[in-house]
Amino acid sequence: MKTKVLSALFAITILLISCQETNIIKNLPDGSSSAPAVSGFFKKNVLVEDYTGTWCGNCTRVSWAMKEAEAISDKVIPVAIHNGNDPYHFPGIAPLKNLILPNSPLALPVSRLNRMEVWSFPETSNVQQAIDLTSNNTTIGIAMNSIVANGTIDLDVKIKCLEDYANLKLVVYLLEDKLYFLQRNYNLDLYNGENPIVSFEHNHVLRASLTDILGEPIGSINEGETVEKRFQIPIPTVTSPPNFSNIPQINPENISFVAFVIRADDNKAINARASHANENQNFQVNP
């Protein structure tokens, strides 16, 4: 009888240990750029940050490559960050420069994919590198809703996760399109070899960062949870850089937003989303 009792207790102990060590393994879908969409998962977009300048004759190479990438995929999120003797110089560029090139000067053009990955030279021959960072299937999604009116911005950014995430940061940019200015062009095979390009249309130009440009901590997000960040601010004013006067203020009709989530440990963007002003978005969920 004693032996039977001991055997039963041993069996119960093994059962308890087994239960404690059980791990639930989730089968996540293929996240490669060519994989078919799986219902319920989010689209994954690639963030392209183009450090550029109107004075930079080689910078047209990157702007051309971005347009080629956009023509291939609707999951490309471009941002043009102007620097130097430029009417659209972004004065808050220093933290970004120190992040991506801590020991080197910012010799333009410079381009980064998902904030930290170098876009291989020449970018026009490596468009697929950017496309390969997109996917039909990821577990974190972004949606934005905005009202831009009467000189003010009311913007909601929502982030939803299909698995647990930790140590996340959010970056939100305000961009402006349809800015026309002379652009130097040293690439004779691009833009018909015109140099300079008169009234070049500059789009996706970074005008303000609504968060810390290196990211605002949002901590952890649990599976199935949605977090929301709201911005209620006046449309930012811009100051004319040295050597330029009377640079127009931001045109509300040409405003757009880019929001992206980065991992705090390596500063890599894990998803991004672009939105026009006064657009109400749903999450990019596969049907």
What does each model-found stretch correspond to?
Residues 8-10:
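Exposed, low-structure sequence patches enriched in small/polar residues
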Residues 37-76:
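Local sequence-structure signature of Cys/Sec-based thiol-disulfide redox active-site neighborhoods
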Residues 29-35, 44, 60-61, 68, ...:
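Membrane engagement elements in two modes
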Residues 18, 55-58, 160:
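The N-terminal extracellular segments of secreted preproproteins, especially immediately downstream
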Residues 22, 50-57, 194-202:
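Short N-terminal helix-initiation segments at or just after the protein's N-terminus
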Residues 2-5, 15-47, 285-287:
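Bacterial Sec-dependent N-terminal signal peptides
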Residues 79-287:
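Short, conserved sequence motifs used for protein processing/export or organelle targeting and
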